[in-house]
Amino acid sequence: MALHKKGISFTLYEDAKEYSAVGAGIGFAPNGMRTMDLIEPAFRPLYEAICVGNKGEDAQDIFFEGMLVEEGLGRDKPWYGHSGWGHPDYVRKSAHRKTLLDIMTSFIPIENVKFNKRLTNIEQRPDGVTLSSQDGTTAECSVLAGADGIKSTVRANVLEHYPNQIAPVYAGAYCYRAVIPMAEAYEILGDLTDVAKIYFGHGRGAVTYRISGGDEFNYLLCVDDSLDGWKLEGAVTETISHEAMMSDFEDPRIDDRLRQLLTKAKPVKWGFFHHIRTASYYRDRVALIGDSAHASLPFQAAGAAQGLEDALVLSSILSEVAKMPERGADLAPFIKAGLSAYDSVRRPRAQKQLEQAAEVGRMIFFQHEEAGADMDKILPRLQQGRFNWLWFHDTNDDVKEAIKRMQKQISVGGPSVARI
């Protein structure tokens, strides 16, 4: 979207035979929406037409409310009714991924997209990059941006000197997830469906919120797996029996309403993986964006917005590179300066978000180093400005800073910076 809006020539290579979305619920915090406004102003009204927030005018600025997994769900606790976190300038909105994807891809000319292209090899040369696909075809480009997800092929090329950082790292937990009609969810949870919730517990947790205009209910039922570890190498999901799934929540201390939700989920373990360490988001002419760069745990609902920030900064850098008269090998120093600037601006922020999301995961399972199982310590950590740096950051400043750093690097190498 960003490249097209800026008039930069591009081709999008997609592994699948058509656009498809993995997962259900997705949303953008204020930083994500402001970034998308800078990428494509026409997106916002289309997005707002399909998204939904919490139910009730007085709950629109609540990000999540904290509850418990245990019997009673925490409604008898002194903190109940005061366990939400958010911000007066934050408005919670979520949508169904498939509907959102349909909107986003409507801004991408279909003639720029090639489907059924599974990337098998990347060859970097002084004058460009050659891509090889499984179907035997090759393609040439000046810059490759890998947005190929958590199991990225492009990541292996960028991090060839850091082989231990290529594969995603298991975070010691997995979840079962489902989307059900709101009527079914209401029968189980009643008005607890009105506002997005995170349920905390010893080794078990849950995340719930409304999507699809309020017609559907999206949820994750989470399991700590830090002792056993993930068994399937190269896979992030595992299909098991219904009985095995139910046994994960058989502890009688768990509220039965969560078990009722679990009966409606498919018996598939979705492993929580992330890229906890990444030495660089680029190498020479190849860059990483989105999950290929900084796949995160979902507990801050911030991964998608970080991908948008990547896209805005990188497309702005490439727009500057495109102004250069040099081509082929002569363009390489400008590309490297641009991608280095992109990395230096985006990586610290994206990695901080990733680390904070992992910390929230530890809170959910009562494993936080300082808060433990004490909700009177957990909730203040979430309520007292934790997300301000993330939500109210001006990504246009990042664009300016990245271009400034690119100019500085180029000026060291010669007078070409005068053309930027």
UniProtKB/Swiss-Prot annotation:
Its EC number is 1.-.-.-. One of its GO terms (molecular function) is monooxygenase activity. Induction: Expression is induced in response to 2-benzoxasolinone (BOA) exposure. The active site is at R177, Y209. InterPro entries: FAD-bd, FAD/NAD-bd_sf, FAD_monoxygenase. Pfam families: FAD_binding_3. FAD binds at E14, G27, R97, D291, A304. Disruption phenotype: Does not affect tolerance to 2-benzoxazolinone (BOA). Keywords: FAD, Flavoprotein, Monooxygenase, Oxidoreductase. The keyword Flavoprotein applies. GO terms for biological process: secondary metabolite biosynthetic process. Its cofactor is FAD. The keyword Flavoprotein applies. FAD-dependent monooxygenase; part of the Fusarium detoxification of benzoxazolinone cluster 2 (FDB2) involved in the degradation of benzoxazolinones produced by the host plant. Maize, wheat, and rye produce the 2 benzoxazinone phytoanticipins 2,4-dihy-droxy-7-methoxy-1,4-benzoxazin-3-one (DIMBOA) and 2,4-dihydroxy-1,4-benzoxazin-3-one (DIBOA) that, due to their inherent instability once released, spontaneously degrade to the more stable corresponding benzoxazolinones, 6-methoxy-2-benzoxazolinone (MBOA) and 2-benzoxazolinone (BOA), respectively. Fusarium verticillioides possesses 2 unlinked loci, FDB1 and FDB2, necessary for detoxification of antimicrobial compounds produced by maize, including 2-benzoxazolinone (BOA). The FDB2 cluster arose as a duplication of the FDB1 cluster with rearrangement and expansion by incorporating additional genes. Belongs to the paxM FAD-dependent monooxygenase family. This is FAD-dependent monooxygenase FVEG_12630. The lineage of its organism: Eukaryota, Fungi, Dikarya, Ascomycota, Pezizomycotina.
